[in-house]
Amino acid sequence: MNGNSKKRTLLRNARALLGDAMAFDGRPRDMLIEGDRIAAIEAAGTLYAADHVIDLRDHLLVPGLVNGHQHSHEHFQRGRTENLPLELWMHLVRTRTPVKLTPRQVYLRTMIGAIESLRTGCTTLVDDTALGAAIDRERIDAALQAYDDAGIRALVGFAMMDKPIVDNFPFVEKHVPAALAAELRAASRPAPEAQLALVRDLARERHPQSSRVGVLVSASAPQRCTEPFLQAVRSLADDLALPVITHVQETRLQVVTGQLFFGCPMVEYLDRIGFLKPATSLIHAVWLNPREIDALARTGATAQHNPWSNLLLGSGVQPVRELLDAGVNVSLGSDGSCSTVTVNMLNVLGSAAAVSKLRGDEHARWLSAHEALHAGTLAGGRALGFGDELGSLRVGAIADLVAYRTDTVTFTPFNDPVRQLVYAERGAGLGLSMVAGEVVIEGGVLTRIDEAALLHEIERDFAELGPLYAAAEAEMQPVLAAVENIHREGLAAAVASDTYAARLA
């Protein structure tokens, strides 16, 4: 999967979470990496021949985390919002007058997420980035180059849609002034055919099964796409054997929207039109009913849990146990850093396990730390079409892995490595990261880029960009006022009585 086909790296003396079950027996191991694959795992002191040897004594070796959802176009907006539900918040990200960035600034913005991801144990990310008013290949190439340079595995999608944002909502005629609605509908956006052609063109050289930095197919959300466009998106993914992502029922209003737009909740609609298939991830999938969960299980689609984002936006808590009971693959994502402030996947693991404990009194059904780690590794690889090749430390698997120091307060005393990793480690103890068999962090230092210089350049540029973001946000106040009314009407509207309650009353 990369040009690292002959190099042999030996990781010595590491305690590891081994196999698809991530079993831990406490005994140190040697692990031989050949090219981009794990070639051998043996008792410590029994493997020798290698080009590069790294001693991982006092480290815990873990599969690299898979972040199934982030938005690189938000990285310059982290920390700018709080205490807004999704429907209001999103209009501060997609403003009427977008801040125009140079290709270099797009590169730097993308690099923020790549650096934070690598520093917190993530080796694979999905970037669902926005195209904006027009397709700009120079800026798209800049984002892809950032991932190339950082050394992370990235699958990039382009949040495709063919409807104006204002028409994603119900009750528009009632609450949005006609002149404002007309202005929003007239905003420039890429032609549907051009969006599909972009993915088809990029996939020739950047297919995720053959390129560390590849593309996938992103339909932004069912309510943002006409049915013919969704069918075209599905056909494109099938033709190219690419994974698919789409936002589905993140909020209660979106359940109401599905009922009004399609005559049923959105997962039922996607099932009806044949959109649900394996390697198709429904992002968020918070507000679900039993029929929708059955559809996910029957079709092999993935429900992706974004717990930290769903908490900060007040969206709700996904019914993870019900999904797992039905046999649905559940993966994890951070979402964008404007809503979450961070793309730290260790934070996502901990919040996924912790927030499940608010769903019901039957404590045996709460999500465990081990289940959260599985969702953030092997299940994430399965969601993206890698089968069992990504997210597991076993012979033959892709060598995407990380090691955390265990001679730290986080792991002292050393009782349960998975619980201490999921609930306490947040990246400070990361000593090693390897992607596709290449060491990208060693001794806590990023090996492929000058991190300090990049962060300094970002801060220097943002001194000018910050006021532009503030002005763009201020311009959205009339839109926020209208959407506030739509949001409140949606809260009052009924949803199917068997929908799992996602919020505390």
Predicted features along the sequence, with ranges:
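Active-site microenvironment of metallo-dependent hydrolases
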Residues: 1-29, 34, 374-505
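Glycine-enriched alpha-helix->loop->beta-strand junction motifs that scaffold or abut catalytic
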Residues: 237-242, 275-278, 295-304, 325-330
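Active-site gating loops and adjacent loop-to-helix segments of metal-dependent hydrolytic enzymes
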Residues: 76-106, 163-189, 252-277, 299-302, ...
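Alpha-helical scaffold segments that flank or form the walls of functional sites
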Residues: 78-153, 194-209, 459-464
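His/Asp/Glu-enriched, well-ordered alpha-helical/loop segment
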Residues: 272-279, 321-408, 424
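Divalent metal-coordination and catalytic microenvironments
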Residues: 14, 31, 36, 58, ...
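Metal-coordinating catalytic core of metallo-dependent amide/deamination hydrolases
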Residues: 138-285
